[in-house]
């Protein structure tokens, strides 16, 4: 095993929050580099995120993938995505994705047949401290109840075939994390014969 101690930076004072927003904080950290030089490094402290690939099992559903469409301010476009959202304080990733699916797509928990964790990863460890956890959720039938959206959330539920999701994943605006979730789902399906 490699000795990473010669690559580590050491903090020499408490981090200072330089910007606080409703969804993340920007923090300056003063650290000593391995060569002994001091520097200030920027970190974004953000909540953990969750997402889920949700499928419907009923045989007559060709459009079995449940996705959401909503306006994304970062790209100023309506994006189609897998249900996703922030993990609230004190909430587990699993509880968070179940809550988000209830809110966004009207998921009826009694219709869940299977839940599997696909992956957990840091979206950008260069300057972010949060984690993204993605699940696969299989539901029986339509799974629909009433949406329970947050204030200022405008989300439309959409159903897609496998090939339609493939097309969405090829868009340059689709997030890396959504693309990775889809790739992990497809890999498990092809290599393991199922999720």
Q: Where does each model-flagged region fall?
A:
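Nudix hydrolase/Nudix homology domain
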Residues: 2-10, 78, 89, 132-134, ...
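Conserved Nudix-box catalytic region and its N-terminal flanking loop in Nudix hydrolases
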Residues: 7, 44, 51-53, 60-99, ...
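Residue-level detector of beta-propeller blades
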Residues: 11, 17-18, 114-117
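Acidic, metal-coordinating catalytic segment for phosphate/diphosphate chemistry
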Residues: 14-53
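Short, well-ordered beta-strand micro-motif
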Residues: 28-30, 54-56, 136-138, 159-161
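Short, acidic, Ser/Thr-enriched surface-loop or helix-capping motifs
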Residues: 33, 59-60
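Active-site segment of metal-dependent pyrophosphate-handling enzymes
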Residues: 47-48, 62, 71-73, 81, ...
